[in-house]
Amino acid sequence: MPFDANLELHDGTTITGTITPISLTRTSGSVVIDMLALSSTPAKGMGAVLIIGTDLATAGNTIAVTIDHSDTEGSGYVQIANFPTLTKGTGMPGTYITRFNTTLQYVRALITVTGTSYSATNVYILLAYHPFHVL
């Protein structure tokens, strides 16, 4: 994968429910990223890439992903970017890109799911300075 593994907000682990990362330690495939080493984001922002490798398992289920930031690792997160809310049969599999700026230290992807018997596989959420080629 052409992305930096240290900038991986979710690593492809199957999602079976809402995931709210609050730690630098990976749990359920998700993690909080410490942006201090990056000295915040560049002037033109940073890209967040959502890759959904397969469709949702059940009709009526949804997945919504937001990018949040905070000055504190475990709490105080505020939404700074979002991806479209996806449902079975709409836009999956697919790749979505959004951009954001932050001067705060911590960034996470909040994954909110609704429905019953929820399962989403091959989901990656990645950060990148330039997630696409500029010609």
What are these model-derived regions, one by one?
Residues 53-62, 115-119:
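Extended, low-complexity, turn-rich repeat/linker tracts enriched in Gly/Pro/Ser/Thr and Asp/Glu
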Residues 37-38, 48-57:
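Short amphipathic, basic-aromatic surface patches that mediate peripheral association
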Residues 59-74:
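Short, surface-exposed beta-strand/strand-loop-strand elements in extracellular ectodomains
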Residues 1-41:
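Solvent-exposed, flexible loop/coil segments flanking beta-strands in beta-rich domains
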Residues 33-35, 92-101:
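Exposed aromatic-hydrophobic patches
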Residues 46-50, 100-120:
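Noncatalytic modules at the cell exterior or secretory-pathway interfaces
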Residues 79-89:
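Solvent-exposed serine/threonine-rich low-complexity stretches and specific carbohydrate-binding patches
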Residues 1-17, 114-135:
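C-terminal interaction-tip segments
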